[in-house]
Amino acid sequence: MSSARAVAVRSRLPEALAWLAFVALLVVPALAWPRGWMLGYLAQTAAMIVLALSYNLLLGTTGLLSFGHAAFAGLGAFVAAHSFNRYGLPLPLVPLAGGAAGAAFGALFGFVATRRAGTAFAMITLGIGELVAAAAWSVPEWFGGAGGVSIDRAAGPALAGWEFGKPMHAYALIAAWCVVAAVAMRVLVRTRLARLANAVRDNPARVAALGTDPCRVRFAMAIAAAFFAGVAGALTLIDVEVATAESVGMLRSGAVLFATVIGGTTAFFGPVVGAVLLTFFSVFVASVSRAWLLYLGLLFVAVVLAAPGGASGRWRAWRDARRHGGARFDARRALPGAGAALAGGVAIVFAAELAYALQFAQNDARRAVIGPWRFDAGAPLGWGIAALAAALGVGLAHAARRWGRGAPRTNGPAFADAIDTCGAACGSAELKARDAGDVDGSTNAASAANETNAVSIASTTSTTSMTSMTSTTSTTSARHAARVSDNAPSPVFEVAAEPVGGGVHAASAPPALRMADVSKSFGATPVLVGIDLTIRPGERHALIGPNGAGKSTLFNLIAGALAPTRGRIALNGIELGRRRPHAVARLGLARSFQQTSVFARMSVYDNLRCAALHAPRARRRWRRGPAAAAAIDRAADAALASIGLAAHRDALAGSLSYAQQRALDVGLALASGASVFLFDEPTAGMSREQARRTIELIRRATAGKTVLMIEHDMDAVFGFADRVSVLVRGELVATGSPAAIRANAAVRAAYLGEAF
């Protein structure tokens, strides 16, 4: 117990030190230099910290890029100012009023914006930001016109002898609210809502398939971010005692974006680092150089190119690599690299200051002040220094690159396969491309398009060979393709049915899945025609057919990702109608995807915890605190052990091999606690042994539950399924037991091949 406690203490020590440094940043300079300029600088920093942390609730936690975040801070400041002036609200409560106003406007605008993600969300917020900025000048009665709305913080009532007219007292209030807001946001990012927001950031289609509407998660996080933005706006109001139209403008929205990206979105304190740097540039660098915005822009570009994770992300990558023995100091590479950065910085500063001196020269005074030196912008000396520094930087950078070629990389640990070693052919198919903005209608658009093309080609060709199995499936399935005449009508084979598991109870219960006359067309091209299929509770049913037959489209119809053109689908006796994917999942349906669909930037364990959150029992008692959390953790642990990834518990899902991600994809479906499972080619890209283990895992984990599986590996199909259905060119041509399907000569001729 003592060793476990020591490990827990050590794991919490870095965050405790970060909080200590954060508080010291706000307190120590104010006590050491209690002057007006220092207190004003610290107040600006504190307000920007809160604003940047609130912005990271959108960008880092939920994956939403906003160009109008400052609008909520500015609107919160205006509401807070009017509350203080008109209603005598005590100054310590002014940030609360600003937060409430920010949340209200966040709900109003977020209701529209969060229906989309990605580029669409960014463009909507850009329009909202411009709308609010225009309104600030068009409604002077509320926004105060050019002068804004001012307050006199000394006019409010004193609190325990504190008169907030004094700069130190006002700053103490701002710093206290900054710490309180930061703690509140830290608590928020540890909640289940934030965990779901991380999942929505990585894979909204998968979240919908688990049973949560991604739009609702985005909406909730947008309101939370707007609340804290309103608090930040009120803190700025307390500092400068005026709310102006500039506070809702695009410049401030861009500033908070810069701060968050420079500091890093992957660590909680990353935006704090960015806010400190941004305020330093806007105050100290701006006081000595007119080119400070240029320097800030160059820093932003450098961070995006060289350290996409920001300063904190770079630090964490180095720390993790060092922890796993991958980070070693290589003087031959590090020293020239540092020298190149220094020389490049000198070249940029000289060139920028000389250019600004030429551009803004007054009375023929073209002097550029660089540190203690003055240079004539028209003389060659300064430009020569800039050119020399640039040449030196290029040379050192080339040397660092050349000498570092043989140095070991610091990409962190290499992870072994969970099931078995995956072939090189598997690795190229790891990642999926999906529009995060429309998870309901385009979940598998590429798959549906492929099937549409396959059907249209088949309908216009006199004779063609049935497409062989996908290149990523096992070598066994490649033998099962056969030629079919497209001029002949699709054969309907009568195959004797055999009773399946479920017993008397299954016979009396409604079908687990019932499809009646289900058809789907894309434009004028039919993909599915008149599908009639009933799957009993507890049945293991396999759906086979050539590529382009419409199998994945049928899965998307069942899961709610697509709406049928005609027909009805019922799950456990409930008509699905036009329910969206999250609503269908809540009725007890879980699915895996044709391509791996996991939450790449979350750990394997957090992936499974996110799925376990959606189990029916967890949904019923998610508010019950520690007991419910412990139950979710136990479910995630059980799923982790069952899929063989216990050794990679804390690894990011995106770092796993293809076979491991396939196993995790299956594990997400299993951990959801559903009663009906759809598995879309769960063994695709696996070796025969990997496929055997995966099928055995599914058989064991879904005992007594209903399974509908698409699979091209006929050995897996005939060894797993109670019944098999054959889909050819969008029509269901046969349904029966594996033995009957295997024995039917017409089915073998159409699809399986004579080898079976």
Predicted regions mapped to residue ranges:
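A short, surface-exposed alpha-helical micro-motif characterized by mixed small hydrophobic
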Residues: 717-719
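Conserved structural motif at the start of ABC-family nucleotide-binding domains
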Residues: 513, 528-530
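The feature captures the beta-strand-to-loop junction immediately N-terminal to the Walker
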Residues: 544-546
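Catalytic Walker B motif of ABC-type/P-loop ATPase nucleotide-binding domains
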Residues: 677-681
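Helix-to-loop junction immediately C-terminal to a conserved catalytic motif
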Residues: 559
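Transmembrane alpha-helices and adjacent helix-loop boundaries
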Residues: 2-420, 491
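Conserved ABC transporter NBD signature motif
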Residues: 567-575, 586-587
